[in-house]
Swiss-Prot record:
One of its GO terms (biological process) is tetrahydrofolate biosynthetic process. Pathway: Cofactor biosynthesis; 7,8-dihydroneopterin triphosphate biosynthesis; 7,8-dihydroneopterin triphosphate from GTP: step 1/1. It holds the Pfam family GTP_cyclohydroI. PANTHER family: GTP CYCLOHYDROLASE 1, GTP CYCLOHYDROLASE I. The lineage of its organism: Bacteria, Pseudomonadati, Pseudomonadota, Alphaproteobacteria, Maricaulales. GO terms for cellular component: cytoplasm. This is GTP cyclohydrolase 1. Keywords: GTP-binding, Hydrolase, Metal-binding, Nucleotide-binding, One-carbon metabolism, Zinc. It comes from Maricaulis maris (strain MCS10) (Caulobacter maris). The keyword Metal-binding applies. The keyword Aminoacyl-tRNA synthetase does not apply. Toroid-shaped homodecamer, composed of two pentamers of five dimers. Signal peptide: none annotated.
Amino acid sequence: MDAVTPDAARIAAAINTKPSREEAEAAVRTLISWAGDDPTREGLLDTPKRVVKAYEEWFSGYDADPLKALGKTFEDVQGYDDMVMLTNIDVESHCEHHLAPIMGVAHVAYLPSKAVVGISKIARVVEIFSKRMQTQETMTAQIADALTEAMEPRGVAVLVDAKHQCMTTRGVHHPNVSTITTTFTGEFRNDRDLKDRFMRLLERA
């Protein structure tokens, strides 16, 4: 499944029709009025500007290309071909259904075939996809797909463990529920021992 290319096309189309900052601020004022408050009172006067600025940060992943983040690789690794694993990468996202925060961590591993990538770049890929309106399932697959497309590894493993405030602070109000999603490709999918090793290493994280 290629979750990278279709998203890139949709995002490019959306950017071409992006509303102005003034239109975005006006939309925030409308929401404040709808919620029952006065957007012209002192405490809320600058709120639309602050919200739009916050959205620029929260959704900065739309302006970044995960494949470019993985563009530089290193082949001189003394023949290293075992698992490369990063644990506890912070995930700060928003659910696409309610725009409520998703907070958690991602654990990512891959088996290099031709080259390795700087470890910070893997964390950057997680950040790019998390800084978008997401479902956790889609984000998990996108991380694996980006690594696969950019590096052609022998396998990728991704596990995301997060809490969704659309469930913890509204609706059913279950604050202690975590959601875990996984994607395994290549040797991680086909080799049960390798998958088990990945899961055992997570216990030490």
